[in-house]
Design a protein with these regions (language model features):
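Class I S-adenosyl-L-methionine
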Residues: 1-15, 20-117, 122, 221, ...
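Conserved beta-strand elements of the Class I
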Residues: 6, 30-33, 84, 141, ...
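Acidic, glycine-enriched active-site microenvironments
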Residues: 102-106, 118, 122-125, 131, ...
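Conserved anion/nucleotide-ligand pocket segment
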Residues: 150-195, 401
Length: 508
């Protein structure tokens, strides 16, 4: 039985502009064939088992000819695979998607087109330029700048284009001087506002503005390279009023997120929403404890405990996973009082239908100790399911009040093997900030570096403009112990507060 090919538009660069339908077929494909302009983050939406084939074309460097790409799609579909052909922008707007669809149709193979947000409208929009506006024009033309404007058989109708309110030219940086000259020659006013937008909708976005007459010179002066979109028309002047993306507080900042990949999304998405370029280098990942028996035993005798204290969201999830394995659910905690370090831990408990009697306002053991002390706990049996390696101040203090405390490892943290390579790449490309959300993220990152690397990171944090952001005082102290200067530490030890503090730092 033959498979099916989905021609999916990846959008202009911002991964959030992928359509819901595009994300859905990506999540269930057997093979992914993708272009240079498709955001690499989108590849993570495909199953780990899916084959990934890069067929990108960058300038004159073609990984694979169009004919071979067509045949590859036919071969994969002929083998019964569900294939996603991920193309930058929209597959049917200067994307050669029509040729690929024709090749599939010629062999009787099933295909479906899932349109994408074309860069022809998205890049101008992110630069604050509407391609149509009743105050300026109600017509727009999309053209390719990849064609040689001087070839005898050119299909470019310059006389007609010169009369259209907005002309949007894709892939035209190389030929920009000729394109502008041709429009002026055809009667377009040389003083017409114009703009070039490179890497539109991404944190690398770069915008150059001018007139039809001087834009080529301005583009050359700043060294603007492809991929870029050119907009010609009165609408380009609206950028002065409507520019928004490049004004975001973290626009263009390269920020490393060191949380575990499974937990990074909230921090990464919050920073991305403020314009940052996120580099995820997970310095920790979470695994079950090497010996699961202590947790299993504790779960089997919950009726013996008066209190269960959770010190992290991971501890909650690991505990409930063990509870489920034992064939139990939250009802087993009916006789226990619950305590949580920080609102994030309490929120995960609430997701399981439970409300903590005691919640520390800050995400640190000392905050929970203060809250529990006010409760007057003494003569109680207390269970603390937590990380295999953790500070002892909490169980020791509670035990000193006359309680019987049992600590069981619910999970352990390890350093992902691929992170050393990711860290080296990130540091070589340059960073504006590194975020740390736990002491273990600091320790693991620094242990990936040799002494020279640690010294250089410390130097950059003090002299080179690298901002170290720590979620709380314990994490900050760990960073300082490695010689790092911590410039950002929120008063409230939460992800949201960390994002706000980092934004405020760069805005100041």
């Amino acid at each position: 039985m033959s498979g099916k090919v989905y021609l999916v538009g990846a959008g202009p660069g911002d991964p959030g502009l992928l359509t819901l339908k595009g994300a859905r077929v990506l999540a269930s494909c057997d093979a992914l064939v993708y272009d240079w302009l498709a955001n690499p983050e989108l590849l993570d939406l495909a199953p780990e088992s899916a084959a990934r084939v890069y067929v990108g074309k960058k300038g004159g460097d073609h990984t694979m000819s169009q004919e071979r790409i067509n045949q590859l799609l036919c071969d994969l579909a002929g083998d019964g695979k569900t294939v996603v052909r991920l193309k930058g922008g929209d597959p049917f707007v200067f994307g050669r998607g029509g040729e690929e669809a024709s090749a599939l149709a010629a062999q009787g193979l099933a295909f479906e087109v899932i349109p994408g947000v074309t860069s022809a409208i998205a890049a101008p929009a992110y630069a604050g330029i509407p391609v149509t506006d009743r105050r300026a024009t109600t017509e727009v033309a999309f053209v390719t700048g990849h064609e040689d404007p001087n070839k005898p058989e050119s299909t470019m109708k310059w006389d007609a284009l010169a009369q259209i309110g907005t002309v949007v030219c894709l892939m035209g940086v190389k030929n920009l001087p000729i394109i502008c000259a041709k429009l002026i020659e055809a009667g377009r006013d040389p003083a017409t506002p114009a703009a070039c937008v490179r890497w539109g909708s991404t944190p690398q976005q770069q915008t150059v503005t001018g007139t039809l007459a001087d834009l080529p010179q301005k583009v050359a002066e700043v060294g603007l390279k492809p991929p870029a979109i050119t907009i010609v028309g009165q609408v380009a002047a609206l950028r002065q009023e409507l520019a928004w993306f490049e004004k975001l507080p973290l626009f263009g900042k390269r920020i490393m997120v060191t949380r575990a990949r499974s937990q990074a999304s909230r921090l990464s998405e919050g920073l991305q929403a403020l314009g940052a370029k996120i580099i995820e280098v997970p310095t920790i990942s979470f695994l079950p404890p090497e010996d699961p028996e202590p947790l299993e035993t504790a779960v089997s005798m919950l009726e013996d405990f008066h209190w269960v204290i959770f010190t992290s969201p991971n501890g909650v999830e690991a505990f409930f996973a063990a509870l489920g394995e034992a064939g139990k659910d939250a009802r087993s905690l009916a006789g226990c009082k619950l305590a949580a370090i920080g609102p994030a831990t309490a929120a995960v408990l609430k997701d399981h239908g439970l409300i903590a009697e005691v919640t520390a306002r800050t995400f640190q053991a000392e905050g929970l100790i203060e809250a529990l002390e006010a409760h007057g706990i003494t003569g109680q049996r207390v269970l603390i399911p937590r990380a295999a390696q953790a500070r002892e101040v909490l169980p020791e203090t509670i035990a000193s009040w006359g309680n019987l405390v049992q600590v069981v490892p619910a999970y352990r943290t390890v350093r992902p093997p691929e992170s050393t390579m990711l860290l080296a790449k990130a540091l070589s490309e340059g960073l504006d900030a590194i975020t740390f959300t736990a002491s273990s993220t600091v320790t693991n990152l620094m242990e990936m570096l040799d002494q020279a690397g640690r010294d250089e990171l410390a130097r950059q944090s003090k002299e080179g403009g690298l901002v170290i952001a720590a979620i709380g005082p314990i994490t900050a102290d760990t960073a300082r112990g490695y010689g790092l200067e911590v410039k950002v530490q929120p008063e409230k030890f939460t992800i949201e507060a960390l994002i706000q503090a980092l934004s405020a730092h760069f805005a100041s």
